[in-house]
Amino acid sequence: MENEDTGTVHLRRIDPSQNMRRFYVLAIQPTLFGGASVIRNWGRIGTSGQSKIETFDSDYDAATAAMRLQKAKRRRGYRDDGTT
């Protein structure tokens, strides 16, 4: 689910037959020097998970990378979190 104010996307993938309960969060934040960063957080639901930050020179490049990551996760079975 995308938060309109921050551009944050919360996804989850739950498959009880495989004991799989995963989350994936994507956010775009401005940097101090005029670029933008894509912040990813992922892991098992109930844990703090792992994080990765990728910095880009422009907002457009960051948004393109975030959309590419979001599409890849949706192809793998991740769906909107459903929380607000």
Over which residues does each language-model region extend?
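Intrinsically disordered, low-complexity segments enriched in polar/charged small residues
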Residues: 17-18, 45, 78-81
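Short aromatic-glycine-(Arg/Gly/Cys) micro-motifs in beta-strand/loop hairpins
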Residues: 25-53, 67
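Short N-terminal "domain-start" leader segments
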Residues: 1-37
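Solvent-exposed, flexible loop/coil residues
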Residues: 37, 60, 82
